[in-house]
């Protein structure tokens, strides 16, 4: 989130600095160690349905065991932003590095909560980050600090964001 925020802030005229706690050679951020999976609904999906689905997720109203601390009053604005910006996320990532690729993840096809309002028509999709033309069979193929052209998962996601930061330095 910090890298994406820094990139967006820089693109909007802010002077930014990204400070990592760990040395670059041994950096093991959450993004880098993640599965590199990101949510990016299809642009052809129904935007109203996507907003309705996002509101259902963010409000907590449709989740059994809703916590008292959840604040449904903020979910409208969050759902509106989600519906507006997430369908363009894959394009935004490719702007950071044209070599970046992402593949639809069959195990995550469609909405995570299929019974929520808007789930059927929202075009929900989940992608997995990669630099190779295809992802190796093993989901946890090691690629930490390896060559960029072999990076997958969180390493690929992080390298893409890192490239976005470096091109603005």
Kindly label every feature range from the protein language model:
Residues 1-55, 122, 137, 142-169:
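Residues forming the flavin
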Residues 21-106, 113-114, 118-121:
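Redox-cofactor-proximal catalytic regions of oxidoreductases
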Residues 82-169:
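Conserved redox-cofactor binding core of oxidoreductases
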